[in-house]
Amino acid sequence: MKNALGWHCALGIIPYRDAWRWQQQLVAERRQNLAAPDVLLTLEHPAIYTLGQGATTAHIHFDPVATGIEVLRIERGGDVTYHCPGQLVAYPILNLRRHCCDLHWYLHQLEEVIIQTLRHYGIKGERVAGLTGVWVEGYKVAAIGIKVTRWISFHGIALNVVNDLKGFGRIVPCGIGDRPVGNLRQFCADIQLEDVRQQFVAAFSRVFGLEFAPKALADLLIPTSS
């Protein structure tokens, strides 16, 4: 059976609010046109903390005004996390009606994408019962936080590749205080983010049965009237 076509937009370091707005527009378009192809955005963010719907500010251990780093509450699931350059962020905009209308299945598949990506580098990624994400030797290297509306997904994955981890020390990452955060460079010293991006997209294609073609984001977004 031939894989369905999807679009992959490989972006650089993008301000969080811009990527958030683009996701919302892509979701709105797919709610209007269920035949629109699935989209995968891969990118990095400048330093920012985001809080999911269930997050508590008690897990933030710094003064955002003093540091100048934005803290933003968004509609994804999960608690507080940190984004910064060197972290591969992936936002799948999928019509889950074409895959499986089951959020547990979807989260499991996202974890599988990460595990297969790590396997390419000889790194064993593992799940932890009762928690969402992927760990390596006890270090959490990937966080997952999603939102699904009318079975269209957005938000997604943050995979620590070569990023500075100091920012995680200011929070209780994902509300989990007893497990350290790590990145892939700890386990593969010469790893490169761009190579990880390629392996991630290949793994995503396998796991979700999609054939991704590169696409400019501007070609996907419908211009809005000013």
From Swiss-Prot:
It catalyses: octanoyl-[ACP] + L-lysyl-[protein] = N(6)-octanoyl-L-lysyl-[protein] + holo-[ACP] + H(+). GO terms for molecular function: lipoyl(octanoyl) transferase activity. One of its GO terms (cellular component) is cytoplasm. Keywords: Acyltransferase, Cytoplasm, Transferase. Its EC number is 2.3.1.181. Disulfide bonds: none annotated. NCBIfam families: lipB (TIGR00214), PRK14345.1 (NF010925). Belongs to the LipB family. In the reaction, the free carboxyl group of octanoic acid is attached via an amide linkage to the epsilon-amino group of a specific lysine residue of lipoyl domains of lipoate-dependent enzymes. This is Octanoyltransferase.
